[in-house]
Amino acid sequence: MVTDFIYDGLRLSDFGYAVVSFDGSRGGEVDTDSQLSYNHVSMMSGKRQPYITSTYDDPLKMEIQIGKNVCTADKSESMFNISVEDMEFLKRWLVRPHPHKLSVVGDDYLGFYWMGSFNVTEHVFGDGRIGATLEFECDAPFGYKDDVVVYGDLNADETFRYNCLSDEIGWIYPDITITVKEDGDLQIKNSDGRVTEIKNCRANEVITIDKNLQISSSSASHKIADDFNYVFYRVNNSFNSVVNTLNTNLAISYEIRYSPYAKVVIV
């Protein structure tokens, strides 16, 4: 059972709270876990309904209940009650207009995190606030694994192989930084057959392509937007193969960074 978490770099237990369960079952409940919706087309009077597309309609949602940690509570006050000021702080910390990183303390969740924000519902008993239910809504239908970084040097027409560690079949746009070591038109290939091409590169030029599909160059004179074919390099993952390749026609140094999807929930 989860007892502690870290949100936006701040740890719950440092403020005197712990993950609890008000109904005696568990501290976290999963509302949605990577549920796909399948779109069909009806054929043969409905006797066949093959899939046309599939989509994730909703983000992952999880519920955590918190209360005062009675082992560390100030014994001069009610050990269970949360003051108005403390509840204000909790809401200021947890309820944000933009997503932040949530990670759970414990070996079972080592290397996993989620991005999102909370809504807070107070629990009142008698005249005091005894805790809160935190409803966490992610920015995706699943969580993430810690960033994977691969880097090194490639000679012209040399190939580097690495594995995609994502739980989700498909592809991910990574952050990729390339230092070109010779003049020329750069071509970047993966095993999926896509070719990323950037023309008129110069030796020692640093090219950056991020996961939000933005490209930039360290060379102010290189009009890279005009020389890029807008085929972005992707990290691929199929059920039968997780192997990716990096192949370039020019000598380069490279760094590829991506966040694998993790189909893991807090329980």
Residue ranges and their predicted role:
Residues Y56-L60, L94-R96, G126-I130, E168-I172, ...:
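Solvent-exposed loop and beta-edge segments used for protein-protein assembly and interaction
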Residues G67-M115:
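Short, acidic/charged, Gly/Pro-enriched secondary-structure junctions
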Residues G27-E63, N119:
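Short, solvent-exposed beta-alpha or beta-beta edge segments that form flexible loop/patches at the rim
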Residues I66-V70, V120-E122, C138-F142, V180-E182, ...:
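Beta-strand elements of well-folded, non-transmembrane domains
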Residues Y144-V267:
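Intrinsically disordered, low-complexity segments enriched in serine, threonine, and glycine
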Residues R96-F142:
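Short beta-strand and beta-hairpin "edge-sheet" elements
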Residues M1-M43:
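Polar/acidic, low-complexity leader/linker segments enriched in S/T/G and N/D
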Residues K47-M79, G128-F142:
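Oligomerization/assembly interface segments of phage tail-like spikes and tubes
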